[in-house]
Design a protein with these regions (language model features):
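Signature of the first transmembrane helix
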Residues: 3-57, 90, 94, 156, ...
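Alpha-helical transmembrane segments of multi-pass membrane transporters/permeases
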Residues: 7-18, 72-76, 115-120, 135-160, ...
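Transmembrane helical elements of multi-pass membrane transporters/channels
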Residues: 7-22, 148-151, 155, 172-192, ...
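Helix-loop junctions and terminal segments of transmembrane helices
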Residues: 53-71, 136-137, 255-278, 342-345
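Interfacial segments at transmembrane-helix termini and the short loops linking adjacent helices
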Residues: 100-118, 302-334
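Membrane-water interface segments that mark the loop-to-transmembrane alpha-helix transition
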Residues: 6-18, 44, 49, 53-100, ...
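Hydrophobic alpha-helical transmembrane segments
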Residues: 43, 112, 116-119, 145-195, ...
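Small-residue hotspots at the loop-to-helix junctions and early N-terminal turns
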Residues: 38-42, 46, 115, 242-253, ...
Length: 395
């Protein structure tokens, strides 16, 4: 336990700071805009995030594998690769928007400028995955944690400042756009400094050939899993209303600290498995993860309603039940988060992909019925049931 804390303290501190900033940001945005506008933001972010992350999510793993597979320098090629993927994703978002220009679901008849700017700046933010992969390979968790913290502090600051000046959805997306531009610039500079000029460089074509097989594996795995992750708010907005989307989104946001723990432990876990294929997961689960899970259950069950009122206000009090339902699913994933990393580094990622297909299938089958009958509680139930089915299969 002591060695675990020593090895993960920078990551845990970083993600702890990020979680606190995220919760405070939720309070500022949700209380300022109310459930309907907060739900609408979730719908916009869900569609945009899906289009980008379906090509970019976990590409840090691709960079990690490539670092082990070649002695040549490839950072410049990796940056170009991510920018091209960003352009493809950007085109996909615009295509979706233009396909439904007069659809009331988006609550606009023509695409606002703030969304165009946010989508455009998101292209460059893709290179963050290159940075994560390089530092995970080097085991430099201190710099990794510092940059993650810096990124979230910048985002928090821009959101707070612009929302305080003008309480609107427009201000929120302008803040996110400014954050993406500034952080992308910083990441770009840091990546250039990490280039080893003593090594021979790999061309973009050769980098693509090196990446192709593992890229397809990661994309299949991530693409399937991202649909319930990012479209849940969109689906509740479609089958119910923006108010229900807002209530559910608050429930999900307040459960997000569990994801921050997973993010904190993941680079460390990847590094450990990379060094020792026989790492003792049983000891990790029962001595570290399980006590954390019990503490979270006690907190959310006994103090969850107060937590919601403190963070989002009384108008979001309906978020308590969906929050508890989501807690069950999220903790199921937390206790077994290491399975994905073990399967990935042992060339068994296909099993995780099958697990995600099961997750997606269960989610798509159950969510329309459960939402129709139970509203925001129904979408939370669909998400948790899907996660549990996935984890049962992977075990």
């Amino acid at each position: 336990m002591k060695s675990f804390l020593n090895e993960t303290k920078e990551l845990v501190t970083s993600q702890g700071l990020i979680a606190v900033l995220a919760i405070v940001q939720v309070r500022i945005v949700a209380t300022s805009l109310g459930p309907e506008d907060y739900g609408l933001i979730g719908i916009y972010l869900g569609i945009i995030a899906l289009c980008f992350r379906i090509l970019n999510s976990r590409n840090s793993d691709l960079v990690l594998i490539n670092s082990k597979s070649t002695d040549k320098e490839f950072i410049k090629s990796a940056i170009l690769f991510e920018i091209i993927l960003g352009l493809v994703s950007c085109s996909a978002v615009y295509a979706i928007i233009f396909l439904f220009p007069s659809n009331n679901f988006f609550n606009f008849t023509s695409t606002p400028n703030y969304l165009f700017l946010f989508i455009f700046t998101r292209i460059f933010f893709n290179i963050f995955e290159v940075f994560r992969g390089i530092l995970t390979y080097k085991g430099d968790m201190k710099t990794y944690s510092f940059v993650e913290s810096f990124s979230n502090i910048v985002r928090f600051s821009f959101v707070v400042i612009l929302i305080s000046i003008d309480t609107s959805i427009k201000s929120f997306f302008y803040a996110l756009s400014m954050h993406q531009l500034l952080v992308s610039l910083v990441i770009f500079i840091l990546l250039l400094k990490n280039i080893n000029k003593q090594k021979a460089s790999i061309s973009f074509v050769d980098y693509f050939k090196l990446s192709k097989l593992n890229f397809y594996k990661i994309r299949t795995d991530q693409g399937i899993g991202l649909i319930p992750t990012h479209l849940d708010v969109v689906i509740i907005g479609y089958f119910a209303d923006f108010y229900s989307a807002g209530i559910y989104r608050i429930a999900k946001k307040l459960i997000d600290p569990i994801n921050y723990l997973i993010v904190a432990f993941s680079p460390w876990m990847l590094n450990k498995i990379n060094e020792d294929k026989r790492y003792n997961f049983k000891k990790l689960t029962f001595k570290i993860l399980f006590p954390i899970a019990i503490s979270l259950i006690i907190f959310y069950y006994f103090f969850g309603d107060t937590f919601i009122e403190l963070i989002a206000g009384k108008e979001f009090s309906d978020s308590y039940i969906p929050m508890l339902i989501l807690l069950v699913g999220f903790l199921s994933y937390f206790l077994t988060f290491w399975t994905r990393h073990f399967l990935f580094l042992n060339n068994l990622i296909f099993k995780h992909t099958i697990g995600r297909i099961i997750n997606l299938f269960v989610f798509l089958i159950t969510s329309p019925y459960l939402i129709t009958n139970f509203g925001f509680n129904g979408i939370a139930l669909a998400v948790s049931i899907a996660i549990i089915f996935q984890k049962i299969y992977e075990f």
